[in-house]
């Protein structure tokens, strides 16, 4: 079972505080209890329980849904670190089920097939904290406005290609800098342009940061990828297919954890990158059809 007690969850501030506890770490996708144990032993701060990692979803196709509750429970029984699980965008009943299972975080994820193409879940009505993906500042603030306690880049999951995660993180950073240069009288118009709640736009313009932790996800496959995202401003990283689609998952998991911790130390990063077997082959994003892009799901 994960370490966060359900009775400790509830208010938005508490949800954000729980997300803050995961800063500086790695959250790993796992599909069974054996992988969950490998992740925990490697130093992961949390695991994401799912039946198919994103690269398999791409290959196998079909409708990707919430994981089987039995799988989630087996993983909860195996590890002591927090256990997250994904629900489909807009599928609040899947979220209700996951909350009843006492998962530690719910990821309303574009990796799964959206259940609602117009509406995301009202996350404020849940006690369990949510994490959501974004491509830019407007999308981040819309999800936070709905109650997301943690934001991550969408990247392009299941590709082993970090280019989209870099694009999304840079977009967020650039738009925050732009916001900070604005006069207060310009912020309402900017909120309209971003499609974001005005009070959150005001908050970011004043503080220069998102009001919730900002993590990186999507295409991270190597220790260098993890360090790159941390140097760009991510506060933690999610790694999906990059670990268990590699030829040496346990060693690569440890290396990515180390690189996330020592992301500003090139000598250590070189050490973490040595003696690894081949990373996942990966996909050139330019070769994907528009309908195969997961990051475009949601709004």
From Swiss-Prot:
Residues given in the record as D-ribose 5-phosphate binding sites: 29, 158, 219, 240-241
PROSITE patterns xref list: PDXS_SNZ_1, PDXS_SNZ_2
Gene Ontology BP, a term: pyridoxine biosynthetic process
Record keyword Lyase present: yes
Catalytic residue list: 86 (schiff-base intermediate with d-ribose 5-phosphate)
Entry annotated with the keyword Lyase: yes
Protein role: Catalyzes the formation of pyridoxal 5'-phosphate from ribose 5-phosphate (RBP), glyceraldehyde 3-phosphate (G3P) and ammonia. The ammonia is provided by the PdxT subunit. Can also use ribulose 5-phosphate and dihydroxyacetone phosphate as substrates, resulting from enzyme-catalyzed isomerization of RBP and G3P, respectively.
Protein name: Pyridoxal 5'-phosphate synthase subunit PdxS
Naturally occurring in which organism (per UniProt): Protochlamydia amoebophila (strain UWE25)
Gene: pdxS
């Amino acid at each position: 079972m994960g370490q966060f007690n359900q009775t400790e969850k509830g208010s938005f501030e508490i949800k954000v505080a729980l997300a803050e506890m995961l800063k500086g770490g790695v959250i790993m996708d796992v599909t069974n209890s054996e992988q969950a144990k490998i992740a925990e032993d490697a130093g992961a701060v949390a695991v994401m329980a799912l039946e198919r990692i994103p690269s398999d979803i791409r290959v196998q196709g079909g409708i990707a849904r919430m994981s089987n509750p039995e799988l989630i429970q087996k993983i909860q029984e195996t590890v002591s670190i927090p256990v997250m699980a994904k629900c489909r965008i807009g599928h609040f009943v899947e979220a209700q089920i996951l909350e009843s299972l006492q998962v530690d975080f719910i990821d309303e994820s574009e990796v799964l097939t959206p259940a609602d193409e117009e509406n995301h879940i009202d996350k404020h009505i849940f006690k369990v904290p949510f994490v959501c993906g974004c491509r830019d500042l407007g999308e981040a603030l819309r999800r936070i406005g709905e109650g997301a306690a943690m934001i991550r880049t969408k990247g392009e999951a299941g590709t082993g290609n970090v280019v989209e995660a870099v694009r999304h993180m840079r977009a967020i950073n650039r738009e925050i800098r732009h916001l900070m240069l604005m006069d207060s009288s310009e912020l309402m118009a900017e909120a309209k342009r971003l499609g974001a709640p005005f009070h959150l736009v005001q908050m970011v313009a004043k503080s220069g940061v998102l009001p919730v932790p900002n993590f990186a996800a999507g295409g991270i496959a190597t220790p260098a990828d993890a360090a790159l995202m941390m140097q760009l401003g991510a506060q933690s990283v999610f790694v999906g297919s990059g670990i268990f689609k590699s030829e040496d998952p346990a060693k690569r998991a440890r290396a990515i954890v180390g690189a996330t911790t020592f992301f500003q130390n090139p000598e250590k990063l070189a050490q973490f990158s040595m003696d690894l077997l081949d990373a996942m082959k990966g996909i050139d994003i330019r070769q994907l059809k528009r309908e195969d892009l997961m990051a475009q799901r949601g709004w």
